[in-house]
Design a protein with these regions (language model features):
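Short, glycine/acidic-enriched loop or turn micro-motifs at the edges of active sites
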Residues: 51, 83, 124
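Acidic-residue sensor for enzyme active/binding pockets
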Residues: 59, 80, 130-131
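P-loop/Walker A phosphate-binding loop and immediately adjacent motor/lid segment at beta-alpha junctions
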Residues: 70-72, 83, 136
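Glycine/proline-rich, positively charged
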Residues: 86-139
Length: 139
């Protein structure tokens, strides 16, 4: 499968990624394992998930497959933060505190100490854009 450079990061990702939005919700662990095995056998390496998918179950299922189907360092994991359904309603919170807490929970569910691409899932009108951007700016 053809790979492309991910920006200036030095990371190479396959042109086609494996989306896991239904994992843990409509797709059980066995079917998820089959999908992942097929994707890896086809040469794929880029796996997309998010904290909000299945209220974290997508990341949990993926975390259970890492190290079993593929070594962690052979895949590129992308996840997202900033949306939750904790109160039963969609809540967007891109504040520094919320994003860091989302990342910590994602890492725990994935069973890893890092993700390769971490994204803010959606715009938050209540949080100034500078807040999530400034916190990761290096001098």
């Amino acid at each position: 499968m053809e790979q492309r450079q991910l920006g200036r990061s030095g990371v190479r990702v396959t042109r086609i990624g494996l989306g896991t939005m239904t994992w843990g919700r409509d797709t059980d662990e066995h079917e998820a394992a089959e999908q992942m095995r097929f994707f890896l056998d086809a040469g794929g390496n880029f796996i997309d998930t998010a904290a909000v998918y299945g209220d974290g179950d997508s990341e949990r299922v993926l975390g259970g497959l890492l190290g079993v189907l593929v070594p962690r360092d052979e895949v590129v994991i992308a996840t997202k933060a900033g949306i939750s359904f904790k109160t039963g309603e969609r809540k967007v919170d891109n504040s520094r505190t919320s994003l860091i807490a989302d990342l910590d929970r994602s890492l725990a569910r994935l069973g890893t100490d890092n993700v390769d691409l971490w994204q803010i899932h959606t715009w938050d009108h209540a949080t100034p854009l500078e807040e999530p951007l400034v916190q990761w700016t290096t001098p």
